[in-house]
Amino acid sequence: MSLTYRDAGVDIDEGDRLVDLIKPHARPTLRPEVLGGIGGFGGLFALDVKKYREPVLVSGTDGVGTKLKVAFAADRHDTVGIDLVAMCVNDIAVVGAEPLFFLDYYATGKLSAEQGAQVVKGIAEGCRQAGCALIGGETAELPGFYERGEYDLAGFAVGCVDRPRIVDGTRVARGDVVIGIASSGLHSNGFSLARKALLDRYPLDHRFEALGGRTLADALLEPTRIYAKDVLALLEQVPVRAFAHITGGGLPGNVPRTLPDGTRAVLEEQRWPRPVIFDLVEREGQVPRDEMYRTFNMGLGLVAVVAPGDEAAAHAALRARGLEAWTVGAIEAGGPGEATCEVVR
């Protein structure tokens, strides 16, 4: 009896069918700089160097983490791709880079073209929101490697910034103002803790009055906000001195990454409203306050540091983009050594 690749668990025909299903989603994301079509060995992108004096390429890679477990349980797969793009492009945008193109890696134990197409539909939507092109990716069918119906995602984004316009935090000074920009919810961090706190007690279809009648699945799968275009628009109007994308490690772990040594950011938690989902996690899981702040974004997905004289202009620019933002603290002199961030009551 002859043995085929399909007998071993890899269905080439299903993979080809997936490629056909995702092309209509990926094609609208392509920018004029993209050369060739979808499905080649490598994605080609002709950088328009005339737009820059000293072009610097910026790259970022990330995943979605155990938020995917919620998607599996809810059988919703069309938004985690947005999360994937957000986690990558937000990281490169905070240094001032315009996201140019994106590639994804989708791995599963048993390929379903329909499920994979839903995932890539979300990735394409994330690319649309970020203004970058989905120029390639990899689909891996790995029999026996994942539970049935499960998959993992990884993304890779490349952008470009003019060297004189890199935002690296070196100009941050004592007295500068810290502005927090609203998150859409948990984003894509802390889901192992959130799932333990909530899903060990409630089903995904449980509706909390505090969530406005939304189900837990709705709240937990709310896509990560993509700030890339907002960051670039703000930089056109205000000389922002530093940005921080608030991901794993929360405010205390991420704000110092963009501050000079010998400084500290002091944030006052009463200055911004905290979305209800964080209160639910804290209460239902009896999670200590410090653990909440070092795990979750706590309602601020992006932080900007500006000079006091630019505070009003920054708020006006963010309002014009439809973003909620608050002055949440200031930069102070710190002790010797690395920068720190403290959230005070």
UniProtKB/Swiss-Prot annotation:
Pfam family, one: AIRS
GO terms under cellular component: cytosol
Pathway participation: Purine metabolism; IMP biosynthesis via de novo pathway; 5-amino-1-(5-phospho-D-ribosyl)imidazole from N(2)-formyl-N(1)-(5-phospho-D-ribosyl)glycinamide: step 2/2
Keyword Cytoplasm: yes
InterPro entries per UniProt: PurM-like_C_dom, PurM-like_C_sf, PurM-like_N, PurM-like_N_sf, PurM_cligase
Assigned keywords, A-Z: ATP-binding, Cytoplasm, Ligase, Nucleotide-binding, Purine biosynthesis
EC number(s) given by UniProt: 6.3.3.1
Gene Ontology MF terms in the entry: ATP binding; phosphoribosylamine-glycine ligase activity; phosphoribosylformylglycinamidine cyclo-ligase activity
Domain of life: Bacteria
Keyword check for Cytoplasm: yes
Record family assignment: Belongs to the AIR synthase family.
PANTHER family in alphabetical order: TRIFUNCTIONAL PURINE BIOSYNTHETIC PROTEIN ADENOSINE-3, TRIFUNCTIONAL PURINE BIOSYNTHETIC PROTEIN ADENOSINE-3-RELATED
Protein name per the record: Phosphoribosylformylglycinamidine cyclo-ligase
Origin species: Anaeromyxobacter sp. (strain K)
